[in-house]
Amino acid sequence: MSDSTKASLSSANMGNIHIDPTGFVKLGAQLPTLANILAQAIDELGLTLSAQQQRSLLLYLDQLLLWNKAYNLTAITDPVEALIKHVIDCLAIITHLPSGSLLDIGTGAGLPAVIIAICQPERSCTALDSNQKKIRFIKQVSSELGLSNMQPIASRIEAHEASYDVITSRAFASLIDFVAVAEPRLADNGYLCAMKGKAPSEEELDALSNDWQFKTIKLNVPRLHDSRHLIELSYKNV
C-alpha cells in the first residue's frame, strides 16, 4: 500500500463525501479504497445517497466482518469482495423495488434487508430468519446505525402472520419454493422480488400458477462479473 493511501486513513473523500474512520474496526487502512468503490457503484447505479447513508453502508460491512466468526454470517472475509458481493449486489435492486412495507425472508446477515433500510428510511423493513444468532446480529447493527425502520424477527416464515407489500429474498435456490412460502404473507396487490443469479428457465416459469405475472430484470452490478437478475412476480390483476 502506498504512503499516500496510508496517509488518507484519517479521512476517505469521495468528491464532497467525507467518511470519518471513527468507529470502524475491521476495514482499517482499506476504508478510503472501499469508500471510493462504494461511491462509484452508487453513481453507476443511479442512486442518490447521503454521506451518512454511505457511512452506514460501510459501518454495516465493518460490523459484518467484525462479528462474522461469532455469528457465522458470511463465507467472504475479504473486505473488497464482501463490499461488492454483498453490499453493492443488494444496492443494485433498490431502484427496481415497488413501494410499500417490505419483508425479507431468510435474511441471514440482513441482506438485502439492512441495505434497503439504510437506503430507504421511509420504508418499513422486516428481516426474518429462523437463526437466532443472525437476528441478534441484525438487531445489534440496526441499533448502532439507528435504523428505526428495521424490525428483525427470529421466526420461520410459516409461523409469521403479518402481510407485506413487497417480499424479497436472496436465500431460495428455487423460485417455486420462494413463491410457495412467501405467497401467504403477501398483501393484496403486492409483489414478490427474488434475487437470482441466472434468469429462471422456461420450465421454472411454466411451473408457476397461471395466477402470476412476472418480470425478469437483468441487473448490472458494478465490479461484479457474475450474472444477476431480479424476478418480480405479482398477481395478474395487479
UniProtKB/Swiss-Prot annotation:
Its EC number is 2.1.1.170. The keyword Transferase applies. Keywords: Cytoplasm, Methyltransferase, rRNA processing, S-adenosyl-L-methionine, Transferase. It catalyses: guanosine(527) in 16S rRNA + S-adenosyl-L-methionine = N(7)-methylguanosine(527) in 16S rRNA + S-adenosyl-L-homocysteine. It is an enzyme of class 2 (transferase). S-adenosyl-L-methionine binds at G106, L111, I157, E158, R170. InterPro entries: rRNA_ssu_MeTfrase_G, SAM-dependent_MTases_sf. Its main location: cytoplasm. It is found in: Cytoplasm. One of its GO terms (cellular component) is cytosol. One of its GO terms (molecular function) is rRNA (guanine-N7-)-methyltransferase activity. The keyword Transmembrane does not apply. Belongs to the methyltransferase superfamily. RNA methyltransferase RsmG family. Specifically methylates the N7 position of guanine in position 527 of 16S rRNA. This is Ribosomal RNA small subunit methyltransferase G. It comes from Psychrobacter cryohalolentis (strain ATCC BAA-1226 / DSM 17306 / VKM B-2378 / K5).
